Curated annotation (Swiss-Prot):
Predominant location: nucleus
Identification of the protein by name: Zinc finger protein 784
Ranges of Basic and acidic residues composition bias in the record: 308-323
Cross-link (Glycyl lysine isopeptide (Lys-Gly) (interchain with G-Cter in SUMO2)): K318
Polar residues bias spans: 9-18
Gene Ontology terms: cellular component: nucleus
Subcellular location: Nucleus
SMART domains linked: ZnF_C2H2
Length: 323
């Protein structure tokens, strides 16, 4: 046993060339190199517990971690794990135990894909959200924003604050007392591909156009107006959907009952009436038709019964009038 230990250490120790590319405390070990484990193309991650006070090194350059099953590359190991979960879900029919939101490392079931993505960072110990004012790093954006708020209320920090006057000059409308928070949030969001921060709530975005659309929620600006009724909207896509109320255009058609809709939201809600369970058209039964659609009674779509059809049209008109 003692003779095998140096071999295991040499196998798991990164080479000098790879040490500069891999983050600290993360060891990538191919399954086929570990005795007693089933063959697999997926990598195994050594789990390391990292506390909030640990100084975490800078994240690796984009594309450092490559998927063994496809050409995809990722900046963080947790993103690679979430990507490989998709391969497992497709090969095993919905992930471990048939649950697409179940972690394939520990079997923990998460409420949804977003929670599952955040859960994988617990296995890797990565903290991509980094404070621009101190060496602290966090696993999620919410605790980082709470931490950064303390820099503005607690005196005696050893870190030099950012040039808030320059931020206010670049972003008109940013109050001087908010400029530090906005700049820190933008720096933290840049580490995860969201370098644009809202000047009102510091929410990060991937594109500046998305940030401007979001800021209209705070300012109340509605630059897109309907040419028929004059109603204003924050986004051009919402205006396009509103215009269908006036034109009568209904581009979304159900393939099961031929009902049409003027927006995708009502169309997806209608599709769920044909299937068991939640989801946009597919439920827990794997796409089995519900009793109303399978028996052809038309109770889910107002087909077959004149009274039901009339009630369906009344409800449809009411939905359109509310828009």
């Amino acid at each position: 046993m003692a003779a095998a230990r140096p071999e295991a250490q040499s196998r798991s120790s990164p080479t000098p060339e790879s040490r500069s590319q891999e983050p600290l405390d993360l060891v990538l070990v191919p399954d086929d190199c570990r005795p007693g484990t089933p063959p697999s193309d997926l990598i195994e991650i050594q789990v390391v517990k990292v506390t909030d006070t640990t100084l975490v090194p800078e994240p690796p350059e984009p594309g450092s971690f490559h998927c063994a099953l496809c050409p995809a590359a990722f900046r963080l190991v947790s993103e690679l794990l979430f990507h490989e979960h998709g391969h497992l879900a497709g090969a095993e029919g919905g992930g471990q135990g048939g649950d697409p939101s179940r972690c394939h490392v520990c079997g923990h079931s998460c409420p949804g894909p977003a929670s599952l993505r955040a859960h994988y960072s617990l296995h890797t110990g990565e903290r991509p959200y980094r404070c621009a004012l101190c060496p602290r790093a966090f696993k999620a954006l919410a605790p980082l924003l709470r931490h950064q708020h303390r820099h503005g209320v607690e005196p005696g920090t050893s870190r030099r604050p950012p040039d808030t006057a320059a931020v206010a000059e670049q972003r008109p409308g940013v109050a001087p007392e908010r400029a530090e928070v906005v700049m820190a949030a933008a720096a933290a969001g840049a580490a995860v591909g969201k370098p644009f921060a809202c000047r009102f709530c510091a929410k990060p975005f991937r594109r500046s156009s998305d940030m401007r659309d979001h800021e209209r929620v705070h300012t109340g600006e509605r630059p897109y107006h309907c040419g028929i009724c004059g109603k204003g909207f924050t986004q051009s896509s919402v205006l396009s959907g509103h215009a269908r109320i006036h034109t009568g255009e209904r581009p979304f058609r159900c393939t099961l009952c031929d009902r049409t809709f003027n927006n995708s939201s009502n169309f997806r809600k209608h599709q769920r009436t044909h299937f068991h369970g939640p989801g946009p058209g597919l439920g827990d039964s794997g796409g089995q038709l519900g009793s109303s659609a399978a028996e052809g009674s038309g109770s889910g779509c107002g087909v077959g019964d004149p009274a039901e059809e009339g009630r369906g049209e009344t409800a449809k008109v009411k939905v359109e009038a509310d828009q």
